[in-house]
A protein has these predicted regions:
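The feature marks the mature, well-folded catalytic cores of soluble enzymes
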Residues: 1-160
Length: 160
C-alpha cells in the first residue's frame, strides 16, 4: 500500500466563492473585501484549476475531471475530498456534511463513471445518514489518513 496516489478526482468549479454556511467553521476561509467581481473570481478560479490540472498531468498524475452542476451553485464543489474517499481495496466512503448546501456536491454519477473507467468499486459505505443526527465527518477536510499505518488523525470541530 502506498501513502499517496497517482489518481486524482477534480471537480471543475462552476460557482467558486466563499461559503457563508461554512465560513465560521473553516479557518482557511475568510470573507474579504475585494475589488474583483464574482465573475472575475470565478474566471480566476477556473484558470487556476486548469493550470493545476496541467501541472499534475505533467507529473504523470492521472486526473479525472468532472464538471460541477451549475444549477446547484456549489461554492465548494472544487473540494470533493470532503464528501468522498477512495480506498485501494475498492471501498468508496461517502461522508456526512454539515452544510445542507454541500450535501448537493455528493454525486453517485461520478462514482459510477469512475467505476466504469478504471477504478474498481467493491463496495460503498454511505455515512450520509448521520446528517439526520447532526453528526459530521467531512472526509479528508476533517481528517488526515495515514493509509500505510491504517490510522486517521483529526482535530475536534463542528465538522469532525
Amino acid at each position: 500500500m502506498q501513502q499517496v496516489t497517482k489518481n486524482l478526482l477534480m471537480v471543475k468549479p462552476a460557482f467558486f466563492s466563499s461559503n457563508p454556511d461554512t465560513i465560521s467553521s473553516n479557518e482557511f476561509q475568510h470573507q474579504i473585501e475585494s475589488s474583483f467581481s464574482k465573475n472575475d473570481i470565478q474566471i480566476s478560479a477556473l484558470s487556476e484549476f486548469l493550470q493545476m490540472a496541467t501541472v499534475l498531468r505533467s507529473k504523470n498524475i492521472n486526473i479525472h475531471i468532472y464538471d460541477d452542476i451549475e444549477e446547484h451553485r456549489n461554492p465548494d464543489a472544487i473540494f470533493p475530498n470532503n464528501w468522498v474517499t477512495f480506498h485501494e481495496c475498492g471501498t468508496v466512503v461517502l461522508y456526512p456534511m454539515m452544510s445542507p448546501k454541500r450535501r448537493t456536491e455528493r454525486r453517485l454519477d461520478i462514482i459510477k463513471s469512475l467505476s466504469s473507467d478504471d477504478y474498481f468499486v467493491r463496495n460503498i459505505i454511505d455515512m450520509s445518514y448521520l446528517e439526520k443526527e447532526e453528526h459530521y465527518l467531512e472526509g479528508t477536510g476533517s481528517m488526515v489518513l495515514d493509509r500505510v499505518n491504517r490510522r486517521a488523525y483529526a482535530c475536534l470541530s463542528s465538522r469532525t
